[in-house]
Swiss-Prot record:
Coiled coil: none annotated. It catalyses: an S-(2-hydroxyacyl)glutathione + H2O = a 2-hydroxy carboxylate + glutathione + H(+). Pathway: Secondary metabolite metabolism; methylglyoxal degradation; (R)-lactate from methylglyoxal: step 2/2. Its EC number is 3.1.2.6. This is Hydroxyacylglutathione hydrolase.
């Protein structure tokens, strides 16, 4: 299968997987127009849509796409049932698309019903995990988000993390503010800065590398613990995650 990214709005990415026959899967189409343009340019035949959560910048294009291609099956969590979903899926279930099984993973935090889809090596994680960061807590708790991103972090090393936003540069600036002397973070920041200066995408990222540079995935790292302990003594990784999320919200 071929992985394609379609820019939308200011910083969204709509992901499309296509097979050799031209059948395709569309993930979180917040806007129909760029998707329709890509379909026409590549002669794709849409088979399915995956929705991760109910926010408009992820579901806004569904209605128009379904009107154009009525055969499309729209998979999504319960919270997207009024956004065009025709097949509600939940944690532990699978969606069979393009000849592949995609596992559904519940990841509450950004929204309460947020889900992700995984079929090795592809992880479509919506607004749960970003390169260098994680989603804001609009509905869920820090505890829920901590558990959610750790579920994703446990996936295979070679997983391709397909995030829904180009937030990498700002996330790495935050990471540097927390761990300014970390070599992995500094190296990745320079790489990301160069890519964005050329208006190039920083995604997808390999999960093995992401674990090294994402401070939200390093809550048991001694360097991070020492930094946090300078301000407050927190015994549990979950508490350290909440501290980081609060810092990022104010960054």
């Amino acid at each position: 299968m071929n992985l394609n990214s379609i820019p939308a709005f200011d910083d969204n990415y709509i992901w499309v997987l296509n097979d050799e026959a031209g059948r395709c899967l569309i993930v979180d189409p917040g806007d129909a127009e760029p998707v329709l343009n890509a379909i026409a340019a590549n002669n794709w035949q849409p088979e399915a849509i995956f929705l991760t959560h109910h926010h408009h910048d992820h579901v806004g294009g569904v209605k128009e796409l379904v009107e154009k291609f009525p055969q499309i099956v729209v998979y999504g969590p319960q919270e997207t049932q009024d956004k065009g979903t025709t097949q509600v899926v939940k944690d532990g279930e699978t969606a069979f698309v393009l000849g592949h099984e995609f596992s559904v993973i519940a990841t509450p935090g950004h929204t309460l019903g947020h889900i992700c889809y995984f079929s090795k090596p592809y992880l479509f994680c919506g607004d749960t995990l970003f390169s260098g960061g994680c989603g804001r807590l609009f509905e869920g708790t820090a505890s829920q988000m901590y558990q959610s991103i750790n579920k994703l972090s446990a996936l295979p090393d070679d997983t391709l993390v397909c995030c829904a936003h180009e937030y990498t540069l700002s996330n790495m600036k935050f990471a540097l503010s927390i761990l300014p002397h970390d070599l992995s973070i500094n190296d990745y920041y320079r790489k990301v800065k160069e890519l964005r200066a050329k208006n190039q995408i920083t995604l997808p990222v390999i999960l093995k590398n992401e674990r090294q540079i994402n401070v939200f995935l390093r809550t048991e790292d001694i360097d991070l613990i020492n930094v946090i302990n300078e301000e407050t003594l927190l015994q549990q990784p979950e508490e350290r995650f909440a501290w980081l999320r609060s810092k990022k919200d104010r960054f």
